[in-house]
Amino acid sequence: TGLDVTTQAAVMDLITSLARERQMATLFITHDLALAADHCDRIVVMHAGHAVEAAPARALFTQARHPYTARLLSSTPGEKTRSAQELKPVPGNLPDLRRDDLPGCRFADRCERRSELCVHERPALDPVATHSAACWHPLFGPPARSRGSVRHA
């Protein structure tokens, strides 16, 4: 992120071409969603230390399922953004990150779609699904499963 745009593009192109040439995977950790969109096949969105959505890159940007992902995307400038007024920041504050034992969804206090279920039971991200959101009330697709009923690959 500290690189100028030209150097950043050259480094990312090199990493991408080496990965394809050598048929290897790369793990790219970033806050730069535009960069991830250009160079990643799949994206996992994290919130408060937990994966909340996993999807093919194009699907994530066109049909975000988790409310946090949608808010994150709407708070980031893009090609269609004309002014700062069009950006929608994610409201509220993060939960206490020192407490991983808290029940419920970590985004519940900041979510417009929350219900009592969100506050009391943490949803699971389906590790097998192509596009999955750890959300009881996703914007698209089926709701999450409870943590005890998730199938594993």
Where are these regions (language model features)?
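P-loop NTP-binding/switch modules centered on Walker-like glycine-rich loops
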Residues: 3-85
